[in-house]
Amino acid sequence: MGTVVYKDIEGGFYAIDGDNGSRYDPINLPESFRKDGLRVKVTARRKMDAMSLHMYGAIVEVVNIAAQ
């Protein structure tokens, strides 16, 4: 479980703050889930071969996502 958050840095991007304190930088967050404050349940895969300018959290590929 976590919350979608919009970060207004580096041109702006959406991330997910996990309830456990972890932060995630999804590379493929669906447009319909790009809503600041949206509670979500996510299954994701860590992308070890990817880089990001955001430097916000673990880079992940969303496998499954649902609003809560």
PLM region spans:
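Exposed beta-strand and adjacent loop surfaces of beta-rich binding modules
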Residues: 11-13, 39
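OB-fold/S1-family single-stranded nucleic acid-binding modules
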Residues: 50-68
